[in-house]
């Protein structure tokens, strides 16, 4: 069983090399750099913002017309869509780095992916294609289990569903879009999760944002992790419930704030809360941290709350058979009231699911805006998911699924260990395939991405507003399809680019 010992979280699980029956997981896997780093980063961003604001004023007053202040003359009299800070940041900082975001791919996003080459000659306002393409090692796609292929049993199953059912179901679940394929994949997912029932939706973001309002209302209380995904935040806002934010992955802080809130009344109704919903994620997509699930289950049981677990990045990616953080920690899935996950990442399809008791899932079927008004998941996407889940559960008669899970775990541990040995500051837990490398400076993360592309390696550069203004980072997404040769080549390139950009903010760790 998972649990806590001496303030450290402990879980059960096995790895291929020297089984680890007790994995000690740091509860604060986000180490801080030297004290002066944030001061220097603050100075850097302040100077850039002051320069941007001065340029904006000069342009507005007609003193100097900058090339960066390009706009549509037909919209000069329009009110701006965003606030002045966002506009200044976008025009003078973000736009200069648009070459490292929204990169167009022209092939299957596997371990190797093709990118369309492009350049800008107007400070990022437009990108022009060169007519050539580059093959790069792919560290940007969420292809955790390596199911993103254009051939093989999953692709064949998807093609067979097109032949049999076509592309579109033609309506919502409550109208004529309730397809037999939906019931089949929902049954498969429920069995995989070891819950009573499940329901699928055609979009992962909407699985959260459109369904949370069906679970709580303005008389309810939501306890939400500070770093929860935007889809969860949107769902909380749409629900109208009073939302209290607790410190990241801190069940004790969650309990304190829950207890304080229960001593009062809902500020929206003036009455006692009618229900409480705690919302957490399995793996946090920008930090790479694995949730301390046993501690949150303990809080849920103590206060009779509903527990909502978003496994967008953890389903398929952790656990001996990829069943997510409940399996990883050795917890009973039925202690989690709503198990949400996306089908776009580990299973290389599209959409999302919710799993739980039949009573909860039937409630969602009846009251969710997604089932009432949204069109349904496409048959070939369903086939891709169903085949991938069967492989991961071992019901295809092979050991492929388990080997994928083992390989992903080995890749995650090896890559993280080697980055730390080189002196990089890396966020997240050792078993997480989401690997953030901290650069802190937005200027450094942009240059880091550009230089990695010269080594034919595609990475994700992340900055504000996806992260705090002073905490820009590179994010590597590992896959079971990455070979050791891939990882060693990447590590050599990362070390070289790290020296060129000055991004060694960690302490060299020789042995972990």
From Swiss-Prot:
Alphabetically list the UniProt keywords: Acyltransferase, Lipid metabolism, Pyridoxal phosphate, Sphingolipid metabolism, Transferase
By its UniProt entry, which InterPro entries does this protein fall under? Aminotrans_II_pyridoxalP_BS (IPR001917), Aminotransferase_I/II_large (IPR004839), AON_synthase_class-II (IPR050087), PyrdxlP-dep_Trfase (IPR015424), PyrdxlP-dep_Trfase_major (IPR015421), PyrdxlP-dep_Trfase_small (IPR015422)
The pathway it acts in is: Lipid metabolism; sphingolipid metabolism
Q: Name one GO molecular function term.
A: pyridoxal phosphate binding
* Residues recorded as bearing N6-(pyridoxal phosphate)lysine in the entry: 345
Classify the source by domain of life.
Eukaryota
UniProt cross-references to Pfam families, sorted A to Z: Aminotran_1_2 (PF00155)
GO terms for biological process, alphabetical: ceramide biosynthetic process; sphingosine biosynthetic process
Reaction catalysis annotation: L-serine + hexadecanoyl-CoA + H(+) = 3-oxosphinganine + CO2 + CoA
CDD domains, per the entry: KBL_like (cd06454)
Q: How does it assemble?
A: Heterodimer of sptl-1/sptl-3.
The family assignment reads:
Belongs to the class-II pyridoxal-phosphate-dependent aminotransferase family.
State the name under which the record lists this protein: Serine palmitoyltransferase 3
User: What organism does the record attribute this protein to?
Assistant: Caenorhabditis elegans
> What gene is this protein a product of?
sptl-3
